[in-house]
């Protein structure tokens, strides 16, 4: 894993550590998540790109794109603070990631990108659709799968 990816992962962890137990559950993370777990996060060669939005050098939002076999997996999060929530930071960082995806789609093997959102996380579902992802599947009435291609 490159130094750049390690630094970005630490910035993602900084954001994720601000999440409540419920928000961690929305992302499929354990309640007691405290940082990078090499067995949980994608290996370095599976990371395609990480986009981070900053406020005065403080990481406040991320959009993470990893390889997941026949598709790419997308993850997004915003620092848990009224100062940053519902201010458009997530949409902005997702759009940066989608711009990169469209520009590099051929090099990525023309794989579609999936965004998984818990069915009880309407904010994530709404953001996925607002950013151009289309709902394609629902698994066990727990996860909605959104596709971008």
Positions of PLM-derived features:
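Conserved acetyl-CoA-binding loop-helix of GNAT-fold acetyltransferases
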Residues: 86-103, 126, 130
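Polar, enzyme-active/binding microenvironments
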Residues: 98, 111, 133
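Conserved GNAT acetyl-CoA-binding A-motif
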Residues: 72, 103-119
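Acetyl-CoA-dependent GNAT
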Residues: 21-24, 28-73
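Conserved N-terminal entry element of GNAT/NAT acetyltransferase domains
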Residues: 1-22, 148-149
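Conserved catalytic-core motifs of GNAT/GCN5-like acyltransferases
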Residues: 116, 134-148
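A short, internal acetyl-CoA/4′-phosphopantetheine-binding micro-motif in the GNAT/acyltransferase core
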Residues: 75-87, 118
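Conserved active-site alpha-helix within GNAT-family acetyltransferase domains
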Residues: 118-137
């Amino acid at each position: 894993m490159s130094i750049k990816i390690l630094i970005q992962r630490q910035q993602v962890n900084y954001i994720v550590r601000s999440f409540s137990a419920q928000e961690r559950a929305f992302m499929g993370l354990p309640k007691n998540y405290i940082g990078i777990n090499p067995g949980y996060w994608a290996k370095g060669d599976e990371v395609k790109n990480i986009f981070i939005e900053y406020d005065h050098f403080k990481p406040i939002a991320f959009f993470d794109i990893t390889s997941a076999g026949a598709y790419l997996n997308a993850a997004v999060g915003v620092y848990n603070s009224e100062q940053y929530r519902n201010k458009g930071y997530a949409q902005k960082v997702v759009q940066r990631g989608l711009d990169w995806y469209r520009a590099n789609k051929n090099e990525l093997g023309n794989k579609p990108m999936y965004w998984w959102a818990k069915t009880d996380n309407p904010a994530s579902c709404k953001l996925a659709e607002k950013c151009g992802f289309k709902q394609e599947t629902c698994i066990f009435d727990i996860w909605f799968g959104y596709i971008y291609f």
